Amino acid sequence: MVKLAFPRELRLLTPAHFTFVFQQPQRAGTPQITILGRLNSLGHPRIGLTVAKKNVRRAHERNRIKRLTRESFRLRQHELPAMDFVVVAKKGVADLDNRALSEALEKLWRRHCRLARGS
C-alpha cells in the first residue's frame, strides 16, 4: 500500500530552496495559478506555496487555497517526477470554488509530468 503522508522532507522550507526553482523553472499555468518546477536530485518531489495577500485578500481564502494545493500534491506525490515545485497563486484564484481549483491543479500536475518526460 502506498503511503500518502506529507512529511517535512516533501516541503520547500528555506529561501534557497525557492531560489533554486525560480532560477530555471519549467512553467505550467492557468490565468489563476502557475506551477514552477525544476528537477532535483533527491528522488522525490517537494512543494512550496506562495499565496500573496496582494492577490488573495482574505486569510481564510489564502488558507483554503494552500490546504487544497497541499492535498492535491499529497495525493499525487507518487505519480510526480522528482522535482521541486513552487505553486504561485495569482489574482482571481480566490474566485475558483474547491472543485474548479482541484481540477486546475490536476491539469497542471499532468502537464508537469509530460514536461518532465519530454526533457
Swiss-Prot record:
Lineage top rank: taxon: Bacteria
Record-level GO BP terms: tRNA 3'-end processing; tRNA 5'-leader removal
EC number: 3.1.26.5
EC class (word): hydrolase
UniProt keyword list: Endonuclease, Hydrolase, Nuclease, RNA-binding, tRNA processing
GO cellular component terms attached to this protein's record: ribonuclease P complex
GO molecular function terms noted in the UniProt entry: 3'-tRNA processing endoribonuclease activity; ribonuclease P activity; tRNA binding
Catalytic activity: Endonucleolytic cleavage of RNA, removing 5'-extranucleotides from tRNA precursor
Protein's job: RNaseP catalyzes the removal of the 5'-leader sequence from pre-tRNA to produce the mature 5'-terminus. It can also cleave other RNA substrates such as 4.5S RNA. The protein component plays an auxiliary but essential role in vivo by binding to the 5'-leader sequence and broadening the substrate specificity of the ribozyme.
Subunit structure: Consists of a catalytic RNA component (M1 or rnpB) and a protein subunit.
Family designation: Belongs to the RnpA family.
Name used for this protein in its record: Ribonuclease P protein component
Originating organism: Salmonella typhimurium (strain LT2 / SGSC1412 / ATCC 700720)
